[in-house]
């Protein structure tokens, strides 16, 4: 996922990252978890318009589907995503 945080809220990226650590990392079925800030680059090909990225890996599609419905994921959306983000893009792939 790629997140564009609220520019009117200076701590929004930190709050989003903390929320991902708190709510998403412990969800069963997540085999790999990485959340972090955008890294500045001198290369024109690198998108530098976002503030935070999240990469999660699952062993199979069923675990990913279960993750979407997990109460901690729903809590993350309500308590960390909605208060801090203006936009997000999701890329699901094998």
Please report, for each region that a protein language model flagged, where it lies by residue:
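C-terminal structural segments of small proteins and small subunits
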Residues: 61-89
């Amino acid at each position: 996922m790629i997140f564009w945080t609220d520019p009117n809220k200076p701590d929004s990226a930190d709050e989003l990252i903390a929320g991902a650590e708190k709510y998403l990392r412990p969800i069963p079925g997540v085999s790999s978890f990485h959340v972090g800030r955008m890294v500045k680059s001198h290369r024109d090909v690198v998108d530098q318009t976002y503030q935070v990225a999240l990469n999660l890996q699952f062993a199979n599609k069923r675990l990913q589907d279960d993750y979407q419905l997990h109460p901690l994921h729903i809590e993350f959306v309500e308590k960390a995503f909605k208060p801090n983000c203006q936009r997000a893009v999701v890329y699901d792939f094998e």
